Design a protein with these regions (language model features):
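Sec-exported extracytoplasmic/periplasmic mature domains
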Residues: 51-55, 88-96, 113-117, 154, ...
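Extracytoplasmic small-molecule ligand-binding "clamshell" domains
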Residues: 29-121, 309, 324, 347-348
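C-terminal motif of bacterial Sec signal peptides marking the signal peptidase cleavage site
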Residues: 14-17
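C-terminal functional modules
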Residues: 303-362
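Acidic, polar ligand-binding/catalytic clefts
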Residues: 85, 89, 93-162, 218-240, ...
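Bacterial N-terminal signal peptides that target proteins for export
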Residues: 1-7
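Extended ligand-binding regions for polar small-molecule ligands
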Residues: 19, 29-41, 82-85, 89-91, ...
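Bilobed "Venus flytrap"/periplasmic-binding protein-like clamshell domains
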Residues: 57-66, 76-91, 125, 145-201
Length: 362
């Protein structure tokens, strides 16, 4: 190396040494710490309104066997009805503190938007547009369904694709109507839609042979078939043309209320996971040693305070209403007239597994 090159290198090293110091590394963010439950401040206009009223206003179907219907004494029964009762229990401590508001499909979302009801529990599908643009939240799925077709067994149909030229009853103002049109358009199958105002009217027209088939959620078809004159003469075709995640709906302007509804549903699922029932939960609250069960039943950590609820809110829900499997079995399953199988509504831990899942309560 010549003298000039060596001098240049020496000068460069000197300049580098005199340059600005390296900046200090950015400070690490402090870890996120949850405030103790008792110190969490809860603000929910809906919760305040329900407590001031002393009753939950819950929107339900006008009459759908298995899901929502008044019995001969005028007492509301059904799967969706019991979800209402579970929410009322969580918030008010009383499963009977519910005003049931029967709503047609065309008015159900308006009723929620206008605050005529606090929550909608009316076999309503969770869709992108309802969630993203209409100002609603879907806290949890209570029933995984799909759209199907009811037809007379005498037609010997193997699938819905054989309904070319058929008259098909469908309820107005529903996702069902849109699914029907898209399905047959994509398959270039011609049909005649018989659009009616309610599922009851669709069933009556189908019974009177004013239409050849009836399309709705499969659970609704099972409900309709159970009250036809001769249920065995009708079959639900194996074709399923959509996925319909059904569950309660709330307004998007109250995050705490959405959490209350969400975790009420999760509580009845967690109860089934833990093997708890309305008959065993009182003893379990006294004897449970598993931390997850103690938290669920309010024996430790007081998680309910984070939602403005009492420590034993989930315990009361399970004691007064039941675990998910109890609610399903008596309204839709083997103890009901519908005798539906659990299908996708099995627990994720079942064999074979279903889609029913609840995050950990901790």
């Amino acid at each position: 190396m010549n003298v000039r090159a060596a001098a240049a290198l020496t000068l460069a090293a000197a300049l580098a040494a005199c340059g600005p110091p390296e900046p200090d590394p950015a400070p690490k963010p402090a870890p996120v710490k949850a405030a103790p439950p008792s110190e969490v401040k809860v603000s929910s206009p809906t919760l305040d309104a329900v407590r001031a009223r002393g009753r939950l206003n819950c929107g339900v179907h006008q009459g759908l066997a298995g899901f929502a219907y008044p019995d001969q004494r005028g007492v509301w029964r059904g799967f969706d009805v019991e979800i209402c009762r579970a929410i009322a229990t969580a918030v008010l401590g009383d499963a009977q503190a519910v005003n049931f508001v029967p709503l047609a499909a065309t008015e159900r979302l308006n009723a929620l938007q206008e605050k005529r009801v606090d929550v909608l529990s009316r076999n309503t599908s969770w869709t992108f547009s309802r969630d993203a643009s209409l100002g609603f939240d879907f806290p949890a799925v209570t029933y995984f369904d799909g759209q199907g077709f009811l037809a007379r067994r005498s037609l010997n149909l193997a699938s819905a694709d054989e309904l070319s030229g058929a008259r098909i009853c469908v309820q107005a103002g529903t996702v069902t109507e849109q699914n029907l049109a898209e399905y047959f358009r994509e398959r270039e199958v011609k049909y005649t839609p018989v659009v009616v105002a309610s599922e009851e009217e669709a069933r009556e027209k189908y019974q009177a042979e004013a239409c050849d088939a009836f399309t709705a959620d499969i659970s609704a078809l099972a409900s309709a078939r159970s009250i036809l004159n001769d249920p065995a003469s009708h079959v639900i075709l194996p074709t399923v043309i959509s996925k319909e995640p059904l569950g309660p709906v709330v307004r998007q302007d109250d995050a705490v209320w959405a959490d209350i509804v969400r975790w009420t549903v999760f509580a009845i699922v967690l109860a089934e996971e833990a093997g708890l029932t309305s008959k065993t939960v009182e003893q379990a609250r006294e004897t449970a040693t598993r931390a997850s069960v103690q938290r669920l039943l309010g024996k430790r950590d007081n998680l309910g305070a984070m939602l403005g609820l009492k420590p034993d809110w989930a315990f009361q829900v399970i004691r007064q209403v039941g675990a998910y499997n109890e609610i399903f079995d008596r309204n839709l399953g083997p103890r009901s007239s519908l005798r539906l199988t659990r299908g996708f509504n099995r627990l994720w831990t079942a064999d074979p597994p279903g889609l029913l899942f609840a995050p950990p309560m901790r």
